[in-house]
Amino acid sequence: PTLSDQEIVRRVQCGERELFGELHTRHYEKVLNYVLRSIWQRETAQDVAGEAWIRALGAIDRFEVREDTSVVGWILRIAANLITDYRRRLGPETQSFEDETDFGAPQFIV
């Protein structure tokens, strides 16, 4: 039987650290795609997504496992915080370009 995300976290918290790889396998693409919506450079997005997984593993013992808690939602929140940090490091000029550029809609510069 397949373990739930919550059960994997419980077992990782009890010392079965190798099971964290199962979460990574299940949800890596989802986390990467989430990051790619904000950071268009694939290599940078992969770095940010990878850092989210590293931080999740480092903080896993503090994650409160409940049946109504989304493990992947927690990892996406970590990724969102890292995206914010990345954008802050870029500075306001680069950030405003990324925020305002939408290739699906016309842009008007006044």
Can you name each region flagged by the protein language model?
Residues 47-54, 69-81:
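Structural recognition of an alpha-helix C-terminal capping motif at a helix-to-coil junction
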Residues 5-6, 24, 28, 53, ...:
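Hydrophobic alpha-helical core bundles mediating ligand binding, dimerization, or RNAP-core interactions
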Residues 6-9, 17-21, 42, 68-76:
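Short, structured helix-loop boundary elements
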Residues 58-66, 76-98:
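Arg/Lys-rich amphipathic alpha helix in sigma70-family domain 2
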Residues 1-2, 93-110:
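Internal acidic/polar
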Residues 8, 24, 32, 42-59:
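Conserved RNAP core-binding helix
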Residues 9-33:
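A short, charge-rich alpha-helical start-of-domain segment used by transcription regulators
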